[in-house]
Amino acid sequence: MNPTLGLAIFLAVLLTVKGLLKPSFSPRNYKALSEVQGWKQRMAAKELARQNMDLGFKLLKKLAFYNPGRNIFLSPLSISTAFSMLCLGAQDSTLDEIKQGFNFRKMPEKDLHEGFHYIIHELTQKTQDLKLSIGNTLFIDQRLQPQRKFLEDAKNFYSAETILTNFQNLEMAQKQINDFISQKTHGKINNLIENIDPGTVMLLANYIFFRARWKHEFDPNVTKEEDFFLEKNSSVKVPMMFRSGIYQVGYDDKLSCTILEIPYQKNITAIFILPDEGKLKHLEKGLQVDTFSRWKTLLSRRVVDVSVPRLHMTGTFDLKKTLSYIGVSKIFEEHGDLTKIAPHRSLKVGEAVHKAELKMDERGTEGAAGTGAQTLPMETPLVVKIDKPYLLLIYSEKIPSVLFLGKIVNPIGK
């Protein structure tokens, strides 16, 4: 039996990422060279963010097609980061397939890893109003003896933490990993790993955790039970939050949908896309990066009466199956080439699990404290009521980049 490399992609808490790339040039030229390097990293990060959005839309369409009537929630950034890190260990057709599937093929490999390094460094924030953490942990069996260069690059580019794990005792290894994840998430995610394939010698865990409060919070005293209309002429009662305020809002005639931005603190925005009656599939088909860019041009500041369902949902997907939709499969097979991790071992990715969890309430996402007030101009408000299936993006203006992407067909369902 060939040893397998387990890959688990989780959404959780990680320590603050710090810049780890060290200059190898003289102090006199440091400023000029660092400015050039910084510019190149920003350009690479910007292109990667665009490709991450494209990946997210592709996966959302595929998952929606194969999982009709089901809530979908994922982090394209989390998935891309993990597989970009695996590019450090992949070669030949296995590497080419990842680059093709994830839209990395036109980017030099050095720019690819430096671009993700920049994204991780720039997006990681920890303040009273916002906590955003991204990172990776490698659980490695001593039998593997991985290449030092792979470990160093994983640390330098992806701030990867390395933890020795005895995969010969699968029960103990499972407990160690689950305890680690539980600790990092302050008990929010428990027993995430349900089983580990025999023969596993390494497991990679990618994390992204987001907790923020709204720039202007909803008043929980006005939240009330209202109807949310499902796709098949039925409805469920959901706690509907309400607020009147100034928001960026627009309408797309081509895709028959309303676009509403509700800002969090610190340049993070929740973007709600509400299709007209019977237009959800039409909207899904039209999802692409250029569509998102066009939406931005349609927005204007208006006084809006907003009604949004409170929700708490989890999206769990088998990436081995999901990524086959975009042509990525060799890394999971016996003939996959991961010899840059360990040249004398035949490795494959045995497990690939993506789990994303979202809690959205009156205070924000994952809860926070504080209040906010807003003075409104005297104008007739536009009414936007999110009371039927919709799409949701959580978006950072800083890179800019889509952090999370979802299709919500039932706020209280699975």
UniProtKB/Swiss-Prot annotation:
UniProt KW keywords: Glycoprotein, Protease inhibitor, Secreted, Serine protease inhibitor, Signal
Major place of residence: secreted
Glycosylated residues in this chain: 221, 233, 267
Gene Ontology cellular-component annotations: extracellular space; plasma membrane
Tissue and organ expression note: Expressed in visceral adipose tissues.
Listed Pfam families: Serpin
Site (Cleavage): 378-379
Regulation: Inhibition of KLK7 is enhanced by heparin.
Post-translational modification summary for this protein: Glycosylation slightly decreases affinity for heparin, but otherwise has no significant effect on KLK7 inhibitory activity or thermal stability of the protein.
GO molecular function: molecular function inhibitor activity; serine-type endopeptidase inhibitor activity
Region (Reactive center loop): 364-382
Endpoints of the signal sequence: 1-20
Recorded consequence of changing residue 365 to R: Fails to inhibit KLK7 activity. Increased protein stability in cleaved form and conformational changes which may allow escape of the substrate
Thermal behaviour (record text): Highly thermostable, with a Tm value of 70 degrees Celsius. Incubation at 60 degrees Celsius for two hours has no apparent effect on KLK7 inhibition activity. Polymerization is observed at 70 degrees Celsius and above.
Gene Ontology BP terms: gluconeogenesis; lipid biosynthetic process; negative regulation of gluconeogenesis; negative regulation of lipid biosynthetic process; phosphatidylinositol 3-kinase/protein kinase B signal transduction; positive regulation of insulin receptor signaling pathway; positive regulation of phosphatidylinositol 3-kinase/protein kinase B signal transduction; regulation of cholesterol metabolic process
Impact when changing residue 383 to C: Results in formation of an artificial disulfide bond which stabilizes the reactive center loop and enhances KLK7 inhibition activity
Subcellular localization, as worded in the UniProt entry: Secreted
Family as reported in the entry's similarity comment: Belongs to the serpin family.
Job of this protein: Adipokine that modulates insulin action by specifically inhibiting its target protease KLK7 in white adipose tissues.
Domain notes: The reactive center loop (RCL) extends out from the body of the protein and directs binding to the target protease. The protease cleaves the serpin at the reactive site within the RCL, establishing a covalent linkage between the carboxyl group of the serpin reactive site and the serine hydroxyl of the protease. The resulting inactive serpin-protease complex is highly stable.
Self-association and partners: Forms a stable complex with KLK7.
PANTHER family, per database record: SERINE PROTEASE INHIBITOR, SERPIN, SERPIN A12
Protein name per its UniProtKB record: Serpin A12
